[in-house]
Amino acid sequence: MRSNPTXSGSEVSAVEKKNLGRIVQIIGPVLDVAFPPGKMPYIYNALVVQGRDNEQMNVTCEVQQILGNNRVRAVAMSDTDGLMRGMEVIDTGVSISVPVGGATLGRIFNVLGEPVDKLGPVDTKTTSPIHRSAPAFIQLDTKLSIFETGIKVVDLLAPYRRGGKIGLFGGAGVGKTVLIMELINNIAKAHGGVSVFGGVGERTREGNDLYMEMKESGVINEENIAESKVALVYGQMNEPPGARMRVGLTALTMAEYFRDVNEQDVLLFIDNIFRFVQAGSEVSALLGRMPSAVGYQPTLSTEMGTLQERITSTKEGSITSIQAVYVPADDLTDPAPATTFAHLDATTVLSRGLAAKGIYPAVDPLDSTSTMLQPRIVGEEHYETAQRVKETLQRYKELQDIIAILGLDELSEEDRLTVARARKIERFLSQPFFVAEVFTGSPGKYVGLAETIRGFQLILSGELDGLPEQAFYLVGNIDEATAKAMNLKT
């Protein structure tokens, strides 16, 4: 049964304070705590370490194992510096609960739901436990529908499923952050939805950069924080493995409230899902479990499934999740990315080659995939257009070696025409972003799916063969490309 959000604060009641234990062993971020007989805490209960002379250390731990001899083993959510054997530990009687609702927008939280942005306490008494079961099958919305993003290359070639999971693959500096911010902006404007960003085990500098860029682009409104479109939850790579393992659940819990109670469409970003697995692996070793393949935890599939199954569409609203996936040593057979792939509905692959050409978003049109690109789901017209675009780009890719050695003149008339159209398509797949207006000076464009299909059909039909390829670069719909061509001629 799903546990509902509670309207109680995080204070420990006087009754619960009586359930005190003592630290008997500390190994890094793992604590063993002894409790009186018959007063053992439950698995996933939050424990709070009490300092000497009632000085609160504010180290929250989560019960992971019950060992026998009235001992439990718990994982700390923050540094264990300064802890000693014999210190008192309070069993709160509940699992970690975090603030939820509109008051979380525009704020930055840690794994415990505590604000870390120095903007004061969160203006809400509504909290929700981070451990919940996935929605029952009868609550799910099984209708397959496209989640329109307004980004041409995504909507045409690798469309997102409403309530689906998308893997975002790309190295450093190819535009992951800008793409994420544009999606946050577009869901707010086109769908009236909100976003939750979970920074799992990534660099603190990147989290800070993202926050600053969101403020610059208006995704976070400093003047009126309530008008912000995103809540941020961070558990960065300098934090203990317990925090990195649970921060994804904290972000998901906030997203679930917007879906189930506010009945909104929510975009949940997890950067990086590999770090979630990595943290689980560290915790598993510390808890003394036997490692599985490549040293990963034996519970890898279960942990991933528990998180991913909560990300879904219900009859109230949807959570569409975009997860950055780091592939260790580019080995796609590694258990961490391989387990992630089993849950994904679409993949968006960012290409360094396209970024080097200045084509943004640098989404690789041939490597990006989607299970939604089927005629029975997207319709014959969309499917045919997407397939013809891919065929044209694939043929251009095959001819590039010949062009590099012999030049364009050695190609047949038909191949020269294919190359010309492919270059127009490649440029038309770029588009100006709203969140990049600050840097580019070009106003952002949201292009509807019907407009996108019409534009590519016109290029493929040959009607625009006479226009220069520069006219298709960084424009919105096809009418802007023809207008730009007229300007270039004059």
From Swiss-Prot:
Annotated GO CC locations: chloroplast thylakoid membrane; mitochondrion; proton-transporting ATP synthase complex
Pfam families on file: ATP-synt_ab (PF00006), ATP-synt_ab_N (PF02874), ATP-synt_VA_C (PF22919)
Top-level EC class as recorded in UniProt: translocase
UniProt keyword Translocase present: yes
Gene Ontology process terms (BP): proton motive force-driven mitochondrial ATP synthesis
Keywords: ATP synthesis, ATP-binding, CF(1), Chloroplast, Hydrogen ion transport, Ion transport, Membrane, Nucleotide-binding, Plastid, Thylakoid, Translocase, Transport
Classification via SMART domains: AAA
Subcellular location, record wording: Plastid, Chloroplast thylakoid membrane
Binding positions (ATP): G170, G171, A172, G173, V174, G175, K176, T177
Known catalytic reactions: ATP + H2O + 4 H(+)(in) = ADP + phosphate + 5 H(+)(out)
EC number(s) on file: 7.1.2.2
InterPro entries on file: AAA+_ATPase, ATP-synt_VA_C, ATP_synth_F1_bsu, ATPase_a/bsu_AS, ATPase_alpha/beta_chains, ATPase_F1/V1/A1_a/bsu_N, ATPase_F1/V1/A1_a/bsu_N_sf, ATPase_F1/V1/A1_a/bsu_nucl-bd
Highest taxon above the source species: Eukaryota
MF (Gene Ontology): ATP binding; ATP hydrolysis activity; proton-transporting ATP synthase activity, rotational mechanism
Function comment: Produces ATP from ADP in the presence of a proton gradient across the membrane. The catalytic sites are hosted primarily by the beta subunits.
NCBIfam families tied to this protein: atpD
Subunit and interaction comment: F-type ATPases have 2 components, CF(1) - the catalytic core - and CF(0) - the membrane proton channel. CF(1) has five subunits: alpha(3), beta(3), gamma(1), delta(1), epsilon(1). CF(0) has four main subunits: a(1), b(1), b'(1) and c(9-12).
Name of this protein: ATP synthase subunit beta, chloroplastic
Organism annotation: Cressa truxillensis
